[in-house]
């Protein structure tokens, strides 16, 4: 059995090829690169396309579907619209359309939004949207890798999304625009609200630069800003303050969910959550009274492949989310 998992991230598309539960290859295409190359042709360098049994696809916010759904039955790529979601490059759209127009079987993973009824109704009452589809994939990877039924997952990269899993189901969490900051994205504060009201900036533009990049003079685009900040942690006071502030913010978000999970298992993921120099996970551990573990860097793509494989093996539900395939 050969499956492919896709993570549609801020800085690019990551794909994992898995055969009989074993990861065979992982490759990444920058969003700007996708506009010049065919995703399927790049995938064909890793695996014969005719041998693929199923692809697990993540796309954008995933707020137009509430089940893991056969791509043939998904309208408008599974989203309500593309407004208010950060910087739009177009690479993910191209990849999605390539897959849908091929004859390769595929499923589309939804995001977590208030139409997903498997979550606690209080979180659905509080927030219209909690996470994009790849966060479900990351959670499933963590669930399968560590075997916990109860844990907190914090995915830290361009943005930070923290989710709570209880009894093997996603219970709720905090989206990128309401809680902790990431490198690029973060919640909108008073100054940004005033700038929006004064028509100096749109809400989406404010969100897209409300992360710790605002602390620095280091914006280098969606793909390279994190390297500029992280690699200068010991050399630039603003970069150090940015990372230290991110660690504080994420630690606060994780701790805010801790009372809901007596097992106190915490799993960190994402390019920043797994960053080793500076050692972000160690810095966060110092602020957390719990069992803190780190998931691999390509966790979203691998998780999407795990979802596809388990659906082929007959699973009708993933972390509480129903399957329509």
From Swiss-Prot:
InterPro entries: ATPase_NBD, Methan_mark_12. It comes from the Archaea. Coiled coil: none annotated. Disulfide bonds: none annotated. Belongs to the UPF0285 family. NCBIfam families: methan_mark_12. HAMAP family: UPF0285. This is UPF0285 protein MMP0642.
């Amino acid at each position: 059995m050969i499956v492919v998992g896709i993570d549609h991230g801020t800085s690019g598309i990551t794909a994992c090829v898995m055969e009989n539960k074993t990861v065979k290859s992982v490759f990444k295409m920058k969003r700007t690169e996708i506009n010049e190359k065919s995703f399927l042709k790049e995938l064909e360098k890793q695996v014969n396309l005719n041998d693929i049994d199923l692809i697990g696809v993540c796309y954008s916010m995933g707020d137009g579907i509430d089940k893991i759904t056969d791509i043939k039955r998904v309208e408008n790529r599974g989203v309500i619209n593309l407004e208010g979601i950060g910087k739009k490059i177009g690479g993910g759209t191209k990849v999605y359309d390539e897959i849908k127009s091929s004859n390769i079987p595929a499923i589309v993973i939804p995001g977590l939004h208030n139409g997903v009824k498997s979550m606690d109704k209080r979180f659905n009452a509080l927030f219209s949207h909690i996470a994009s589809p790849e966060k479900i994939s990351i959670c499933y990877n963590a669930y399968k890798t560590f075997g916990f039924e109860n844990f907190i997952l914090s995915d830290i990269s361009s943005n930070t999304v923290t989710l709570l899993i209880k009894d093997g189901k996603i219970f709720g969490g905090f989206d990128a625009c309401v809680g902790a900051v990431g490198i690029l994205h973060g919640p909108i504060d008073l100054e940004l609200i005033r700038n929006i009201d004064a028509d100096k900036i749109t809400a989406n533009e404010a969100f897209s630069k409300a992360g710790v990049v605002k602390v620095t003079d280091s914006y280098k685009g969606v793909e390279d800003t994190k390297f500029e900040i992280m690699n200068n942690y010991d050399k630039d006071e603003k970069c150090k303050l940015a990372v230290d502030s991110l660690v504080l913010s994420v630690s606060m978000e994780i701790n805010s969910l801790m009372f809901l999970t007596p097992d106190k298992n915490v799993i960190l993921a994402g390019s920043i959550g797994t960053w080793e120099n500076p050692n972000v996970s160690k810095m966060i551990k110092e602020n957390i009274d719990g069992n803190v573990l780190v998931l691999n860097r390509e966790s979203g793509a691998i998780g999407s492949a795990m979802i596809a494989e388990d659906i082929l093996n007959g699973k009708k539900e993933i972390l509480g989310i129903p399957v329509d395939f």
